[in-house]
């Protein structure tokens, strides 16, 4: 990958000039000028996904200049580097190959002179065999009973991805009850353990190194809870499996290394649901549906790696995001799925985006003087409409939004889905076009009221509009379409990182807090007053100790 400061390109300078021309142009004006705008600014993927980006403050000229930026920063070369196994995560000297995990074409992908696909396929086959034994009931616990509950113990990418997907695919769920524990707060695991039986529970300990503090603390508590009933350490092997590469530590914990599922250093945590970390997904929806998930992602991988920028969906969404973040000064994006099963999707890509592109140093090691990753947040519709949409509609901040919905619901109960989708369509229309003062006054007249007597209320009912949105309409949320949707967002994030000249696949920002926590932990174990920190931290620790005593 080339290290190119995007602000030093001629495309960036052209975009700055273009922004000066566009900043006061409204979405309403853009639609009024072009009756064919929707067809020009939307695209369909595999007849399964319609992406409508017409309600944005962009023109064909805007997209052309953004695509020039992608060319000048060598996005095409960056894509080729990732897919070919080049070590583009330079700060950790690692390749970035989550795409290999879903490489259903099985074409060779080489890292350090070795094709990784045989090992990828071997782990997949091992996951299939293990999961089929658990799901069928042929795998028995220490008292001879089949497994009924699975508890995934992980954190970050070892938790957010599997939890999001198992929730999104609940319509495909089998009889196994799934539970996820991540927080080192003992309350999290305590509440889960209240609802499971040690005789019929399988724990998945998801930690590449088998040393992650939060995960191993929870794993040891789960083991202690289990042994309080089971008694004999040998029974651990029937109730614990590991998603790890540290065979020695796994064995010492009591897990049979035959039930250790490996993944590789070229699998980043927040891109790991496609790997052994996805075992909980397989146990929830079955191996065939997991393969469909992989296949959907692979289809999007092919689209991303082979489609020209002007028709490439992840690239288009990424470029539009850069346009808002760096030229309009919009520092945030909302992800708003109109599907209750997708209630963890925004949280998943909050990590996916903010941990990937929340960087202030470029690939040359220099502080940037432009915006990098946006703040990502969101909740399912229509709940969000009754919470924070007020600010999106009438606040002083521009919040570009992605609205996501399925045309076909898994629960066609009465007229629930038409009502849900009517809100989905209405919100993007309202955000784009708003409601003028004239319309508000006419509404009063239609109600037989004199607008003059209500003049003091009118300004509060005016919606300026001109608030940008993307709409992603899926035919139906299936394992395949969900896989494609996740990969769409993954590649959007990669594209933005490549263009903005940052390293997307490391996460050094999580380290300092962990180091300081390890230093502070011993100080919390006795009653002595602490004075080794700043006055604020000392004061907080000492008050904690006083109240705990």
UniProtKB/Swiss-Prot annotation:
Broadest EC class assigned to this enzyme: isomerase
EC number of this enzyme: 5.3.1.9
InterPro entries reported in the protein's UniProt record: G6P_Isomerase, G6P_Isomerase_C, Phosphoglucose_isomerase_CS, SIS_dom_sf, SIS_PGI_1, SIS_PGI_2
Intracellular or extracellular location(s): Cytoplasm
Pfam families named among the record's database cross-references: PGI
Main subcellular location: cytoplasm
Pathways involved: Carbohydrate biosynthesis; gluconeogenesis; Carbohydrate degradation; glycolysis; D-glyceraldehyde 3-phosphate and glycerone phosphate from D-glucose: step 2/4
One GO molecular-function entry: carbohydrate derivative binding
Active site: 355 (proton donor), 386, 514
Swiss-Prot/TrEMBL keywords: Cytoplasm, Gluconeogenesis, Glycolysis, Isomerase
Gene Ontology biological-process annotations: gluconeogenesis; glucose 6-phosphate metabolic process; glycolytic process
One Gene Ontology term, aspect cellular component: cytosol
Catalysis: reaction(s): alpha-D-glucose 6-phosphate = beta-D-fructose 6-phosphate
Listed PANTHER family: GLUCOSE-6-PHOSPHATE ISOMERASE
Family note: Belongs to the GPI family.
Entry function: Catalyzes the reversible isomerization of glucose-6-phosphate to fructose-6-phosphate.
NCBIfam families: PRK00179.1 (NF001211)
Name of the protein described by the UniProt record: Glucose-6-phosphate isomerase
Native organism taxonomy: Bacteria, Pseudomonadati, Pseudomonadota, Gammaproteobacteria, Enterobacterales
Gene: pgi
